[in-house]
Amino acid sequence: MAKRIQFRAHGGPEVLEYVDYQPAEPGPQQVRVSNKAIGLNFIDTYYRSGLYAPPALPSGVGAEGAGIVEAVGSEVTRFKVGDRVAYGSGPLGAYSDVHVLPEANLVHLPDAISFETAAGVMLKGLTVQYLLRQTYELKGGETILFHAAAGGVGLLACQWAKALGVKLIGTVSSKAKADLAKAHGAWETIDYSHENVAQRVLELTDGKKVPVVYDGVGKDTWPASLDSVAPRGLLVSFGNASGAVEGVNLGILAAKGSLYVTRPTLATYANNAENLQRMADELFGMITSGKLKVDISQRYSLADAAKAQTELSARRTTGSTVLLP
């Protein structure tokens, strides 16, 4: 028997259970992975709370991890037993000793990158890759606004933007987080606990605003995001850390300057094995070249997943958090 985290009903972290389970044999196009490290992400809390609907209850949790292939299905061609692999997408159930998932969801993990680093960077790093390199392809020289700059995604974005020659303005909730974001490459920071975000963006851009805002916070930052985008600019809403944006009046986009809004997902960009591996290879290259440093700032045992999610939701974490089986 193996161990996993599951929930039988939606609710707070207290609904998470640490239970015994029997991992399935891989189907023809599936791979069974012995997890060595598991990533913790806000999206995990969305499924637990009921904001997103899992396929069924009881449900596993998590979609990011890294480990070693221990079994492959009869039609699997890209992986063999013993391969080092990483993944950053479903099915749910990564919070486990052993996880079975489609071959197409896995990437080869270079020896130079540890399991903890991979588990702490796959979903967040691939998110930054598509945000900065595809959703709005930054060329260098732009000034952008990125909310929650001291979080796991934010710290990677700070570094990647700097490597591209982009000035990233990051929003934070404290001086300590401002210092952390700047240490990772943020050009300027705005402390939203006592500063007016949109007003500071105007000041920092000489009244021009920014061509793109990246907003993974959601409800709390939506108004400031709209007020920070330059006319005909793009607001990239990629997360709901503070709650979902609801009741949007499309007329506001006209009033604010013919704005564009997109709600991208990793699944759309990494829509096949080739695109996923290409994106991962660029991410891994940024890490091995030293341009991207992955901060594993918190480590919890798998059994303490509820505590880890509590800290994440309370915004008491920085960088990446991993669970260790």
Task: Set out the residue ranges of the language-model regions.
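Adenosine-nucleotide cofactor-binding segment
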Residues: 163-221, 272-274
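NAD(P)H dinucleotide-binding glycine-rich loop of Rossmann-like/cofactor-binding domains
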Residues: 87-150, 160
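Hydrophobic/small residue at the entry helix of a nucleotide-binding pocket
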Residues: 153
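Glycine-rich beta-strand-centered segment in the early N-terminal region that forms part
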Residues: 22-39, 49-93
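C-terminal hydrophobic helical "lid"/dimerization subdomain
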Residues: 273-325
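Glycine-rich phosphate-binding loop and adjacent beta-alpha segment
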Residues: 164, 172, 220-291, 325
